[in-house]
Each structure stands twice: as C-alpha cells, then as structure tokens.
C-alpha cells in the first residue's frame, strides 16, 4: 500500500516497538519437511435425486429438473446449481433467506497499468481459539508472527474472548473489526491504518448450527475500491450440505459485488473447510490464489497433521481447508504459508492451521 512517508514511518516504528515488547515469546523455527469423490457412477437415479436435494437444501422435484438436463451426472448438476445465475435466489434461500445487496460504487476504475508497483498482501488464519491449551502463549505467538509478516489485510477465524489481549494489541497497527464478539467464537478482519473503511456488515448463516457468518468490509486504498469477505464455513464432512450452500451463497455475493462495482478489488477467503470436490464453478474472473501462484504442493495443505501435531487425534490427515479467492486489477500473486514455527515454551504450534499469506500485484 502507498501513503505518506510520515504515516509509513510512524506505523513501522510502532511495529518495531511491539516486536520488542513481546520478545518473551520464543519461537523455534523448524525445518519444513516435505481426499473423497462423489460416488456418481454407483448411485441410482433415485439416490442422486435424494443426494442433490440434501446438499442444496432444495426438493427432489427441483433436483430432477436439473439432473435430467445433464444426463443424471450429479457432479455436473451441482456445478450448474452453484455456478448459474439462474439459481442465485434458490441458493440464497437455502442459506439465509433474502440477502442484502451491496450498494454500487462510483469509484474510478483502475487498470493493471495504473497500478504498476502497487502491492496488497492478505493473510488468513484460523487461530484455533477453541483449543484452550496454552492459549495465551499461542495468541502471543500469533500476534508476533503477524507483526513480522506485516500483511496489509488479515482475516482471522476461531477468535475467542478468552486471552484476546495479544490480538487486541494489534490495534496500534490495524483497524480491527469483529464479526460477533461475545459469541462462543467468531471471525475478525484487520486492515492497515492506511485502509479507508466505509462499511462493515455481518451476515449470519441461518442454516448454520456453528455460529458461522460472512463478514464483509468495504473501503478503499488510495482511491481503489476494495471489498473484503471473511468467513468460516461449516466444519466436518457430515455437514457438507450446509457448507456447500454457504459457499454458493458467498460466491453469489462475490458475483453481485463484482457486477455492481466494476474494477473493484475483491478478496474472499477464510477457513472454508472445503474438500476439492465441493468447489463449484466460481464466477468469471475470480481466481484461487494458491492455484494462480502455481499450485505448489509445498504450500497446498493448510491443515496438515503430518507436520502439525497440535491435534494428535487426527494424525494422518491433511487438507487445503484455508483458501483465498480474488478478483480485480491486481492480476499476479505470490503465495506462502506462515505460522509453521513451533513455540519453544509449550512445544506446540500457534494453531493447528497454517496461515495462508498472499501478495497481489500488477
């Protein structure tokens, strides 16, 4: 991001001061050591009707109207449902009823040429606040890593009230917006002081049994319109119907924002809990940051129990749960994982998830 030299120097001075203050958090850097399909062919047409209706929270008559048009291919039918504008209203109703619309922007449209030399970095991290073990130490480590990486924008999931102080202290560097503080757990969006915030919305998923929301922050960076969408979708394989419906709703919201705000920079991500086969067709022009950066297997798995032993009962599983999608005039991206350092004092990692960190540029 760009701003006046005085502002940049002031923020950098604060960041260095905070790094000194939390030097008691010792982090040992470790060397970096190096999942199910839809059973389409084995299912009867009746089973496909039932499965489609459950996943999409519709009925079997509706399911038949789509399945018969794609030769009863369940995967294709789900792609049609979640990717077509024609079913946006049905998808929205499945998640939460009628949704609010984002106001269109009158901001000037900037091209990649206009933004040469301009970069924006976005980090997303499920910080596992629900695990009470060594929580304060882990939150200090999270804050320590955030200050070292220094992203412009930070999405957090599984934030809890207990031992929140290290995260709250980041307000000297960031503007902090919580989704539903006081709830059992929630999300947060942190933005650089150079980000001009115009609006903050929280949409509660009515089909969620886990307090899940979509948090939306609208603002601008140096005249460039920016929308930030942070979410934590329904967890576990058995809650796939709710998760798929929530993901479809979020992508409809992204599509709506793009249509109403040409040239805006849109970031959508978080702990999506997605399996690859659950990803439906995303809107045109929207890219997956990890894929766009080259799909490096070294940075693929964000929940990896082979390398992260915080959740010992799940050893042997690794998933790409945490994802970041974007659209806009910044068309290139660099992608890394952060938070892979073990904390010396408690011999655990800051979270059971790695943080994803992406830098976007023209």
From Swiss-Prot:
CDD domains for this protein: TDP2 (cd09080), UBA_ceTYDP2_like (cd14672)
Outcome of gene disruption: Suppresses axon regeneration defect in mxl-1 background mutant. Suppresses the axon regeneration defect in sdz-33 background mutant.
Gene Ontology molecular function terms on file: 5'-tyrosyl-DNA phosphodiesterase activity; identical protein binding; metal ion binding; nuclease activity; single-stranded DNA binding
Cellular component, GO annotation: cytoplasm; PML body
Ranges of Acidic residues composition bias in the record: 1-10, 21-33
Cofactor field: Mg(2+); Mn(2+)
Biased composition annotated in UniProt, kind: Basic and acidic residues: 11-20
First-level EC class: hydrolase
Note describing how the cofactor binds: Binds 1 magnesium or manganese ion per subunit.
Site (Interaction with 5' end of substrate DNA): 185, 303, 321, 353
SUPFAM superfamilies found in the cross-reference section: DNase I-like, UBA-like
Pfam families, sorted: Exo_endo_phos (PF03372), UBA_8 (PF22566)
Region (Disordered): 1-43
Disulfide bonds: none
Family label: Belongs to the CCR4/nocturin family. TTRAP/TDP2 subfamily.
Subunit structure: Interacts with mxl-1; the interaction promotes axon regeneration after injury. Interacts with ets-4; the interaction is required for the sumoylation of ets-4.
Function: DNA repair enzyme that can remove a variety of covalent adducts from DNA through hydrolysis of a 5'-phosphodiester bond, giving rise to DNA with a free 5' phosphate. Catalyzes the hydrolysis of dead-end complexes between DNA and the topoisomerase 2 (top2) active site tyrosine residue. Hydrolyzes 5'-phosphoglycolates on protruding 5' ends on DNA double-strand breaks (DSBs) due to DNA damage by radiation and free radicals.
Name recorded for this polypeptide: 5'-tyrosyl-DNA phosphodiesterase
């Amino acid at each position: 991001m760009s701003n006046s030299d005085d502002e940049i120097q002031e923020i950098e001075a604060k960041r260095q001061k905070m790094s000194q203050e939390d030097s008691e958090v010792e982090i040992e850097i470790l060397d970096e050591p190096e999942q199910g399909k839809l059973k389409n062919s084995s299912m009867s047409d009746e089973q496909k009707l039932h499965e489609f209706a459950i996943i999409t929270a519709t009925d079997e008559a509706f399911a038949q109207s789509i399945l018969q048009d794609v030769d009863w291919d369940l995967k294709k039918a789900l792609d049609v449902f979640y990717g077509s504008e024609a079913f946006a209203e049905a998808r929205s109703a499945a998640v939460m009823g009628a949704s609010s619309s984002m106001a269109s922007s009158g901001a000037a449209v900037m091209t990649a040429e206009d933004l040469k030399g301009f970069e924006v970095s976005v980090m997303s991290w499920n910080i596992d606040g629900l695990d009470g073990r060594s929580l304060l130490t882990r939150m200090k480590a999270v804050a320590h890593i955030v200050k070292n990486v220094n992203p412009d924008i930070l999405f957090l999931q599984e934030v809890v009230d207990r031992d929140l102080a290290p995260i709250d202290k980041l307000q000297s560097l960031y503007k902090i917006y919580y989704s539903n503080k006081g709830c059992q757990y929630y999300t947060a969006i942190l933005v650089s002081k150079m980000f001009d915030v115009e609006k903050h919305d929280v949409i509660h998923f009515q089909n969620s049994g886990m307090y899940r929301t979509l948090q939306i922050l609208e603002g601008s960076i140096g005249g460039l319109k920016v929308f930030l969408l942070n979410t934590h979708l329904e967890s576990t394989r058995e809650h796939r119907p709710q998760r798929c419906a929530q993901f479809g709703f979020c992508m409809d919201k992204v599509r709506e924002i793009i249509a109403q705000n040409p040239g805006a920079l849109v970031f959508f991500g978080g702990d999506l809990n997605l399996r690859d086969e659950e990803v439906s067709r995303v809107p045109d022009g929207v890219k997956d940051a990890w894929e766009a950066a080259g799909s490096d297997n070294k940075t693929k798995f964000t929940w990896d129990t082979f390398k992260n032993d915080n959740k010992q009962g799940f050893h042997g599983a690794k998933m790409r749960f945490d994802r970041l999608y974007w659209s806009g005039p910044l068309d290139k991206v660099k992608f890394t994982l952060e938070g892979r350092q073990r904390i010396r004092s408690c011999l655990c990692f800051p979270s059971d998830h790695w943080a994803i960190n992406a830098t976007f540029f023209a």
